[in-house]
Curated annotation (Swiss-Prot):
Belongs to the ArgJ family. CDD domains: OAT. GO terms for cellular component: cytoplasm. Keywords: Acyltransferase, Amino-acid biosynthesis, Arginine biosynthesis, Autocatalytic cleavage, Cytoplasm, Multifunctional enzyme, Transferase. The active site is at T185 (nucleophile). The record marks A184, T185 as: Cleavage. Pfam families: ArgJ. This is Arginine biosynthesis bifunctional protein ArgJ. It is found in: Cytoplasm. Substrate binds at T148, K174, T185, E271, N393, T398. It catalyses: N(2)-acetyl-L-ornithine + L-glutamate = N-acetyl-L-glutamate + L-ornithine; L-glutamate + acetyl-CoA = N-acetyl-L-glutamate + CoA + H(+).
Length: 398
């Protein structure tokens, strides 16, 4: 597997574009991904019960068959809690995209992100779709068009050889606040020119989302609009992938690399964040327990503020373990921060405070927890909680 300098349109047969339609003051705010041939597709959605209109429209597109040729996305407006008119507007976005690209209606997915409750300005949406280019657009413009409070574009591309053919996979995501997925707002789109059955793609997506996107948190809020969509158009012309083969294992490894990179990028770009926090839990009896405990630690406001302040307060970590709901032995926990052991058998060790303080000034903080009761592990990612987070969200609508 090779990391390449690419974009969401790097896999064969894919194109992307983005434009400024006026939903936001300056940045691009509408874009699409287009495949020149129908692509096998898979998707997962927010677990928030107040799902936005685009979620329902995309689910409808998947009803007839698991194939897509395009994804239309707008930012600046979530089209959530907008009633029947919001649903009609999302359907209109799908219809206009299908008409312009000359593809079937049910081969278009729709995604939106932004302020909840405002009606879509359909005059701007319509004009924006008309501006988008089918095959001569700029993929970087799409990557900008999906952003809201994000401070940087989140993109990654890999290549590997499968069945004697070069296969490419690219991913792009947005997310900075309202991130606590349970597949926030989190949108992620993955393209690949690999040939893989839709059913196997859906199964793999669910596994990787549980290991990556569902293990990140910024502020504990789960969005109405979370969506991850994968398109595999087969243009690499590799033999159709089959589960249990060496080629499928290579593809799955590449998929893991893409989703993990995007997930960590979202966590690192949390609103007002200055540090990425990574929590690794080992020695659990079940993977689910390890993941649960890791996510509870990284979700703790007290752990997050301690990371912001450079305070190695292990009491906040042990407290989060205690209410996590995961299984552990209270008297047999080891905690390390940056490889420095600060707790052994649930008792504080003698450690180098100066070295710990210096480590906590770094931008990537790794907390290791060993439960010593099993062989399973899990990882979660988040960010610190700063003054800037409050400032951004206190003034979000203005």
């Amino acid at each position: 597997m090779e990391l390449i300098k690419g974009n969401i349109a790097s896999p064969k047969g894919f194109y992307a574009d983005g434009k400024h339609a006026g939903l936001k003051r300056k940045r691009n705010d509408i874009g699409w991904i287009y495949s020149e041939v129908p692509a096998n597709a898979a998707a997962v959605y927010t677990m928030n019960q107040m799902q936005a209109a685009p979620i329902f429209v995309t689910k409808d597109s998947f009803q007839s068959n698991a194939k897509l040729q395009a994804i239309i996305v707008n930012s600046g407006n979530a089209n959530a809690c907008t009633g029947n008119q919001g649903m009609l507007d999302a359907l209109a976005m799908r219809a206009q995209t299908a008409e312009k690209l000359e593809i079937p209606l049910d081969s278009v997915a729709v995604a939106s992100t932004g302020i909840i409750g405002d009606m879509l300005p359909m005059d701007k949406i319509n004009a924006g779709i008309e501006m988008l280019e089918k095959q001569t657009g700029n993929a970087a413009d799409f990557e900008e068009a999906i952003l809201t409070t994000d401070t940087f574009q989140k993109q990654i591309s890999f290549q590997t050889e499968i069945g004697g053919r070069k296969v490419t996979m690219s991913g792009v995501a947005k997310g900075s606040g309202m991130i606590h997925p349970n597949m926030a707002t989190m949108l992620a789109f993955i393209t690949t020119d690999a040939a893989i059955p839709a059913e196997l793609l859906q199964k793999l997506l669910k596994i990787k989302v549980d290991k990556t996107f569902n293990q990140i948190t910024v502020d504990g809020d789960t969005s109405t609009n979370d969506m991850v969509v994968v398109m595999a158009n087969g243009c690499a012309e590799n033999p159709m992938l089959q589960e249990g083969t060496a080629d499928f294992a290579k593809f799955a490894d590449m998929f893991q690399a893409v989703t993990e990179h995007l997930a960590k990028s979202i966590a690192r770009d949390g609103e007002g964040a200055t540090k990425l926090i990574e929590v690794q839990v080992n020695g659990a009896t079940k993977t689910e327990d390890a993941r649960m405990i890791a996510k509870k630690i990284v979700s703790s406001s007290l752990v997050k503020t301690a990371a912001f302040g450079g305070d190695g307060n292990w009491g906040r970590i042990i407290c989060a373990i205690g209410y996590s709901g995961g299984r552990f032995a209270p008297d047999n926990i080891t905690i390390k921060i940056g490889g420095i052991e600060i707790l052994n058998h649930s008792s504080q060790t003698i450690y180098n405070q100066q070295a710990l303080d210096a480590y906590l000034e770094e931008e990537h903080i790794i907390i290791e927890v060993d439960l010593h009761i099993g062989l399973e592990s899990g990882t979660a990612w988040g960010c610190d909680l700063s003054y800037e987070y409050v400032k951004i969200n206190a003034c979000y609508r203005t």
